Swiss-Prot record:
The keyword Repeat is annotated on this UniProt entry: no
Subunit note: Part of the 50S ribosomal subunit. Contacts protein L20.
HAMAP family: Ribosomal_bL21
Claim: Ribosomal protein is one of the keywords in the record: yes
Role played: This protein binds to 23S rRNA in the presence of protein L20.
GO CC annotation terms, alphabetical: cytoplasm; ribonucleoprotein complex; ribosome
Family: Belongs to the bacterial ribosomal protein bL21 family.
Official protein name in the record: Large ribosomal subunit protein bL21
Amino acid sequence: MYAIIESGGKQYKVAEGSVIKVEKLDVAAGEKLTLDQVLFFNDGNGNVKIGNPLVAGVRVIAEVMEQGKHKKITVFKYKRRKNYRKKQGHRQPYTKIKVEKIEA
């Protein structure tokens, strides 16, 4: 059984027990979370539900494991011959969640 959900403008394939990192959500660690933006659902027995754009009656229950930041990336802007250099760093925040069950 798996589902494809949308969170933070991105799509994720999730199954029961899977751990994923999504864009930062305003939820504390340890709290339960209901994701009802389900785009696709497959129960494993050949029954498939495709949303238009969302599947009605299907939701994903997850627990927030932690809030964190990804590794730092360097953003470097440069203009030749003009002595213009700009160096910045960026760490994108994320929320790590564990899918507990998919309710259909």
